[in-house]
């Protein structure tokens, strides 16, 4: 019977091609809008390292001056730490791994076939960064902990930077000039650009990963001025690197890998003891607010999913609902126009259930075709967004890629909604008395 109902549906399509195309087009537009919006929203709202959510913690202290009378501070401690606080906490042996970091700009030169210097955004960090955040390598690997102490002149390149400087070949072991100092390449990253950039959201929640990585201690050796966010208070106004490391300024990020509750409690106590010591010395005059942020709470703190994104998602589903309502109206009109044929089938012995199933199969075919076209449209729209924002750091260009799980959910939801919306027209045509249309024949 199913094959018979499919043949009847195809005949119906040929009888009313314009109306059928209109219904399919409405469904396709609604589904494509939902898929594109839900894909971007799902990427924004996702935790890019969910499997380590209860292991990785952002470390914050509040070393700022007391707030002015009457002022309120609902945001909690700043994301970053001062040089003294960050280096002290980094020296703890409690975490399994730890990562201290800043971002800055530097120049790479000396690569074969490149006469001039290439300006890069690099990250001065520690060896733990790569293993903590599961950073993949195409060639080589990270430097070891001993290289952090020296520091040794070692560097890790991103895949894109290695492609640019060495044509994508294995450059491990080669030398390159970093700010006119010879550095040895120890590793080249594979494709890695998690969104949101959970490990560093001091400036923005979405963006491109760093192009090169060097041991954090080179920051002090070369007096590298940070390019990331910096916040100072009091009379702090540093103009040189020695002034910066002693100033009341926060500009360094610190993460700790704490695998169990015992290590978390131990490190929290370590932070609290440090706070008490500094408080006695005249620092940390605000109420104690030492925090360890798991990744999911860190993302929530930074409002990664904005109210505008939520509103856009609601509008996309509202648009789909409007498309479906219009489709129901058009479909009901189409079925009622074919009521004389339905009356003949009823007179020949077809039951109301058979009529209902016949029109439900037709609705399902329309939903299937509309969903397929909507999927193709959404693919084209996501490609267009990527092309539009190619080369920019805009979040939409980075997030507009096909996420199979998000697309599957959106497609299944839209197709199911279309099928449910078609229940009423199919039921309504089955309730039409056949005698009325037989008399008109």
Segments (PLM) and residue ranges:
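Transmembrane alpha-helical interface segments in multi-pass membrane proteins
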Residues: 325, 341-386, 409, 413-417, ...
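C-terminal membrane-exit region of the final transmembrane helix in multipass inner-membrane proteins
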Residues: 406-441
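Intracellular coupling helices
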Residues: 6-18, 325-361, 365-366, 431-440
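Membrane-helix entry/capping segments
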Residues: 1-6, 11, 15, 19, ...
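Membrane-proximal extracellular/periplasmic loop immediately following the first transmembrane helix
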Residues: 37-110, 116, 248-253
């Amino acid at each position: 019977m199913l094959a018979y109902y499919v043949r009847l549906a195809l005949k119906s399509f040929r009888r009313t091609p314009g109306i059928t195309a209109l219904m399919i087009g409405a469904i396709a537009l609604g589904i494509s809008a939902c898929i594109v919006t839900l894909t971007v929203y799902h990427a924004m709202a996702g935790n890019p390292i969910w499997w380590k959510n209860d292991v990785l913690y952002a470390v914050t202290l509040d070393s700022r001056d007391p707030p002015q009378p009457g002022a309120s501070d609902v945001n909690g401690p700043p994301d970053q730490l001062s040089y003294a606080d960050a280096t002290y906490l980094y020296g703890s042996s409690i975490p399994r791994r730890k990562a201290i970091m800043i971002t800055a700009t530097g120049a790479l030169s000396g690569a074969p076939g490149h006469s001039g210097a290439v300006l890069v955004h690099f990250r001065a960090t520690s060896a733990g960064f790569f293993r903590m955040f599961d950073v993949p390598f195409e060639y080589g690997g990270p430097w070891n902990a001993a290289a952090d102490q020296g520091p040794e002149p070692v560097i890790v390149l991103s895949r894109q930077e290695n492609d640019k400087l060495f044509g994508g070949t294995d450059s491990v072991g080669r030398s390159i000039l970093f700010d006119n100092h010879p550095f040895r390449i120890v590793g080249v990253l594979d494709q890695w650009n998690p969104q949101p950039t959970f490990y560093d959201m001091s400036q923005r929640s979405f963006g491109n990963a760093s192009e090169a990585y060097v041991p954090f201690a080179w920051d002090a050796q070369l007096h590298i001025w940070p390019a990331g966010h910096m916040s100072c208070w009091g009379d702090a106004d540093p103009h040189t690197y020695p002034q910066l490391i002693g100033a009341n300024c926060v500009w360094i990020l610190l993460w700790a890998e704490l695998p169990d509750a015992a290590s978390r409690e131990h490190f929290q106590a370590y932070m609290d003891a440090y706070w008490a010591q500094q408080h006695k010395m005249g620092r940390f005059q605000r109420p104690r607010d030492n925090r360890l942020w798991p990744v999911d709470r860190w993302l929530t703190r930074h409002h990664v999913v904005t109210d505008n994104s939520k509103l856009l998602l609601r509008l996309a589903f509202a648009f789909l609902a409007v498309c479906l309502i219009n489709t129901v109206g058009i479909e009901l009109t189409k079925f009622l126009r074919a009521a004389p044929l339905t009356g003949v089938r009823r007179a020949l012995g077809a039951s109301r259930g058979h009529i209902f199933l016949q029109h439900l199969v037709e609705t399902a075919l329309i939903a299937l075709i509309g969903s397929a076209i909507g999927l193709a449209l959404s693919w084209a729209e996501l490609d267009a967004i990527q092309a539009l924002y190619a080369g920019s750091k805009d979040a939409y260009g980075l997030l507009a890629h096909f996420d199979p799980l998000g697309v599957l959910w959106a497609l299944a939801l839209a197709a199911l909604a279309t099928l449910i919306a078609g229940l009423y027209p199919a039921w309504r045509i089955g309730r039409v008395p056949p005698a009325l249309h037989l008399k008109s024949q």
